[in-house]
A protein has these predicted regions:
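Conserved N-terminal catalytic core of the sugar/cofactor nucleotidyltransferase
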Residues: 2-5, 13-16, 20, 28-113, ...
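Short beta-strand segments
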Residues: 6-7, 55, 110-113, 142-146, ...
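Residue-level signal for inorganic ion chemistry
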Residues: 26, 36, 94, 115, ...
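Generic secondary-structure signature for well-ordered alpha-helical cores
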Residues: 31, 41, 45-48, 69, ...
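General beta-strand structural signal in soluble alpha/beta enzymes
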Residues: 54, 80, 110-111, 142-144, ...
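A residue-level structural signature of the nucleotidyltransferase/glycosyltransferase Rossmann-like core
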Residues: 109, 190, 197-198, 261, ...
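Conserved core of the sugar-phosphate nucleotidyltransferase
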Residues: 120-218, 225-234, 251
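Left-handed beta-helix
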Residues: 202-393, 398-412
């Protein structure tokens, strides 16, 4: 089995913590490890590192390399999309790469987002292993989440008859519903949340792409290297729209007894980590008489008094305050900021580079103050400036500096 982890998304619903420069999958939201590291470790129990493929944006490649190292999966493969084109082109690119590596047409492929929370992991792995026979038999298996409440933030999948074991035939994929429709879906008992996870054989998905997504198949059939050149020719479309909603080969396996959360909104995070009063606090927080309120801070003290049904997310350069239940609308707010060309959509005060990171501490007309962290053994490129001067103060560590034609060693001032 090959594991394909889709790690190219921007996670705009978790703004301002998630930015396009450092999106959701790299955040340490659910514990000490990032969501991507947790995802990689989840699949290391199903496949070796050499059988894991990470599909990502070229701007994230160094982040992914660091995450793979942390997870002990340095031998996993990283492929980058030339441009963002949604999940159908990303999956087809991964398939072409797998074929280029010499995989047989019968090879099974598991597709997973990079940023979901799933536990217990062992039960999840057992479910995946049990469903592989369906994929080998020509089915495209999707994994449904048993809904425990009406939820308008997820798509739904309607099932019909049981086809084998605990697998069901799929009748239809449903868009994110309104409150009334979501309640009807839960009451009906045959609807599941769409987890975005799929499993299939290469030959099955090839046939379905050819039948239902000819524009994608035309580029895919040219091979991996040609796909990199022609990637932009493929439509911007999800695998759900391109194939799953049209295919007669779909089967759904419920993730029964397994906790799943796509951590797709601030409401989802608040619900997952709140205490018995509905409150969730992270950072230097002093709160009195607050109920059903989430406050996340990073650097400064945040004091809250008599707050109800609020979400407060504070970062060094952006403060988000929103009513609970409205976090699905954060994406609209981000789109407005994009139209206004606000740099905060893309940039953080701290920016990560292959050699380390830098944090902007202060800036104004004629000056900018940065804190630069260089990883052990890493180096910055040589630079030459005509219109500005740089002054370095070394806080910790030692290094070698090239200055004109001389090399000098430096340490703390």
């Amino acid at each position: 089995m090959k594991i394909v982890i889709l790690a190219g998304g921007g996670g705009s619903r978790l703004f301002p913590l998630s930015r396009s420069c450092y999106p959701k999958q790299f955040l340490h939201i659910a514990g000490e490890k990032s969501l991507l590291v947790q995802t990689i470790e989840r699949f290391l129990g199903l496949a070796e590192a050499k059988d894991i493929i990470i599909v990502t944006n070229k701007d994230y490649i160094y982040h992914v390399q660091a995450e793979l190292k942390e997870a002990g999966a340095e031998y996993a493969h990283i492929i980058t999309e030339p441009v963002g084109r949604n999940t159908a082109p990303a999956i087809s690119l991964a398939m072409a790469y797998i074929k280029m590596q010499g995989a047989a047409d019968s090879e099974t492929v598991f597709i997973s987002p990079a940023d979901h929370l799933i536990k217990p992991v062992e039960e999840f792995r057992k479910t995946v292993v049990g469903a592989e026979s369906l994929a080998k038999a020509g089915k495209i298996v999707t994994f449904g989440i048993v809904p425990d409440k009406p939820e308008t933030g997820y798509g739904y999948i309607k099932t019909t008859d049981k086809i084998s074991g605990n697998a069901y035939a799929v009748e239809a994929f449903k868009e994110k519903p309104d409150d009334k429709t979501a309640a009807e879906y839960v009451k009906a008992g045959c609807y599941y949340w769409n987890s975005g996870m799929f499993m299939f054989s290469l030959q099955t998905m090839e046939a379905e792409l050819k039948a239902h997504a000819p524009e994608i198949y035309a580029v895919y059939s040219s091979g991996y290297e040609a796909m990199l050149t022609d990637f932009e020719k493929m439509p911007d479309i999800s695998i759900d729209y391109a194939v799953a909603e049209k295919s007669a080969r779909m089967a759904l396996v419920p993730l029964t007894g397994i906790y799943w959360n796509d951590i797709g909104s601030w409401d989802a995070i608040a619900e997952t980590f709140s205490d018995s009063t509905g409150n969730m606090y992270s950072g230097d927080i002093i709160a009195e008489n607050c109920t059903n309120t989430m406050i996340l801070g990073q650097e400064r003290l945040i004091a809250g008094l008599d707050l109800q049904n609020l979400m407060v997310v504070d970062t060094p350069d952006v403060l988000l305050v929103a009513q609970k239940g409205k976090s699905q609308d954060v994406k609209q707010l981000v789109n407005k900021l994009k139209k206004e060309k606000r740099k905060e959509v893309d940039e953080n005060r701290t920016m990560y580079r292959p050699w380390g990171s830098y944090t902007i501490l202060a800036e104004g007309e004629g000056y900018k103050v940065k804190r630069i962290t260089i990883n052990p053994g890493a180096k910055l490129s040589l630079q030459l400036h005509y219109h500005r001067s740089e002054h370095w103060t070394v806080i910790s560590g030692t290094g070698k500096l090239t200055l004109d034609d001389k090399e000098v060693f430096f340490r703390e001032n």
